[in-house]
Design a protein with these regions (language model features):
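Active-site-proximal helices and loops of the catalytic beta/alpha 8
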Residues: 1-44, 81, 100-129, 133, ...
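Aromatic/acidic polysaccharide-binding cleft in carbohydrate-active enzymes
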Residues: 4, 9-11, 50, 54-72, ...
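Short, solvent-exposed loop/turn segments at secondary-structure junctions
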Residues: 58-62, 97-99, 164-166, 174-177, ...
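Hydrophobic, well-ordered secondary-structure elements that form the walls
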Residues: 59, 82, 94, 130, ...
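Acidic/polar loop patches that form or flank catalytic/metal-binding clefts of enzymes
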Residues: 89-93, 138-146
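Carbohydrate-binding surface patches
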Residues: 148-187
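Solvent-exposed beta-hairpin/edge-strand motifs
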Residues: 185-200
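C-terminal beta-strand-rich structural cap/linker in extracellular carbohydrate-active enzymes
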Residues: 205-224
Length: 224
């Protein structure tokens, strides 16, 4: 999962040598990303996938900030996807603070507990909100994962987690241009309300229809 996220969300500044994977990563377009994730989900039974440890980085890799070439917009999309993906999220210490570090050149330094000036408080806040969302949501902890391909247009990415009567839908824009998505009636439930939103606006588009306007690198998570 980590290699797929880096290949898709990484962009032009992606560092192609990912030490933990032990191989060179190539850029993926959206079709390749969706295909790769679906193949990954098909390798094991759903109950096994839900117990897998999802680790984006470790002491044997570059830190995420270095992996994404310092591009925090892309980094955030990758973090959100990893938190909402089936399995147990594993966070290497300091990633939530936006610490830099290349493999064997800063990735194993001590945690800067007493130096809050270098903490990325905005990124830390995102990690906290995602952790709280995971903790209290059955759809994320136990639910099915599926891409909503009618809304995946090469720039916008849409996917859903669902379990019983609970569901979450995530929209994100992995591009530098605004995206307008015409949503089907009821796609976001009867009373759309985002539990996480950065740059997504909903506009009426006729009787009981909505258009989701996604700013560049925007994301939103809706509880259905």
């Amino acid at each position: 999962m980590s290699a797929a996220c880096i290949s898709y969300f990484g962009g032009k500044k992606l560092k192609l040598t990912h030490s933990y994977a032990g191989k060179e990563l190539k850029h993926w377009n959206q079709a390749a990303f969706i295909s790769g994730i679906e193949r990954l989900l098909g390798l094991y039974k759903p109950e096994t996938t839900l117990k897998q440890m999802n680790m984006m980085t470790s002491h044997d890799t570059d830190r995420m900030l270095d992996t994404y070439g310092g591009d925090e917009k892309r980094l955030k999309l990758s973090v959100i996807f990893s938190f909402l993906f089936p399995g147990a999220i594993n966070i290497y210490y300091g990633e939530e603070l936006g610490l830099p570090g290349a493999f064997n050149a800063g990735t194993r330094q001590g945690m800067p507990w007493k130096n809050e000036k270098i903490w990325d408080k905005d990124l830390l806040g995102l990690y906290k909100r995602l952790a709280a969302l995971r903790k209290g949501d059955e759809a994320i902890k136990h639910g099915k994962f599926e891409f909503l391909k009618e809304y995946c247009d090469g720039r916008a990415l849409a996917f859903r987690r669902s379990s019983g009567g609970e569901a979450l839908l995530c929209l994100m824009n992995n591009s530098s241009s605004e995206v307008n998505l015409a949503l089907k009636q009821g796609a976001l439930g009867n009373k759309p309300g985002a539990v996480l939103n950065s740059g997504v606006k909903l506009k009426p588009a006729g009787p009981k229809k909505l258009t989701a306007v996604l700013a560049p690198w925007a994301y939103a998570v809706y509880r259905l």
